[in-house]
Amino acid sequence: MGGGKHGRGGKHGGSGKSRVWTIVLIVAAIVLVISLGVLGVIGYGYWHGTKVYDGISATSGLAKEETALADMTVNWDALREQNEDIVGWVYMPGTSIDYPIVQGENDEEYLQKDFTGSTSGLVHKGAIFLSADNAGDFSDSNSFIYGHNMNDETMFAHILAMTDQATFDAARTFYILTPTQNYRCRTYALDVVKNTETNILQPNFADEAAMRSYMTARINDSAVGAPTDVDLASVTKLFTLITCGDDYANTRAVLCGGCVEQAAPANAE
C-alpha cells in the first residue's frame, strides 16, 4: 500500500510540473508576440517618418543638380502651406541630411512634433529646427540648427558618424537655403561636448577677433583633424549643426560650418 501511495504521489507531481511548464510556455509565447508587435510598431514608425520627409522633400522642389548657388531654389509657398514655421532648408550632399528647417516658440516644441505637426506613434523624429534664440532670418553671426540622432541613420544621425575622420572628410559641404539667401558652408570642426556646456552657443560676437577666437576654440576641441581649406579670416558667418552624442542624454555632437559663399536665390522673396 505504501508503494501504491508513492506511485500515485509521483504521478500527481509530474502532472503539476507539466502544468507549470505549460503556463511558462504560454507566458513566453505571449511575451514574444507582444515584443514582436512592439518591434513592428517601432519599425513602422521609422518607415512612416522617413516617408513623411521624403514627401516633403518632393514638395520642396529643390533643384539639387544645380551647381550655381543662386539656382538652388525651394518652393517656399508649398512648404508654408504645410507649416508656417518653415524658415529654411538644410542639405548636405552625399548624406541623408536633406530637410526643412523650422523655428518654434522654444527649443522643445519640435523635439517630438514633426514638420506636419504630428506627434503620434512610438517613434518621434521631430523636425530639424533653428534655435529659438536665433533670428529667424539667419541674420545672426552663428545660427544653431538641431536635429535628432535617429537609429535608422536619418535626421542628423550622420553628424555623429562624422566623428570618424574618413566620414568627416567625405562630406565637407552643406547648404543652408532660405527665402532670401542661400549659403554654401564648409565644415571646419566637429566637437563632442557635454550637454551642459553652453559657452559654445554664441549667436553673435563682439568683433571679428572674438569670432576668430571662437572658431579656433572649436578647432582645438575638434574630435577630428581640422581641415586646412577653410580660411578663417574670410569667414563672416557660421552655421552650427547639433545632435545627440552616443549616450544621447549627456553629450552633443556639434558640427561647425563656415559660410564660404552666399547668393540670393533666383526666386528670392
Locate predicted features.
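Hydrophobic membrane-insertion alpha-helices, especially the h-region
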Residues: 24-40
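N-terminal Lys/Arg-rich, disordered targeting/topogenic segments
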Residues: 1-20
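Solvent-exposed, non-transmembrane regions of membrane-associated and secreted proteins
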Residues: 35-269
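Non-membrane alpha-helical secondary structure
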Residues: 15-21, 48, 71
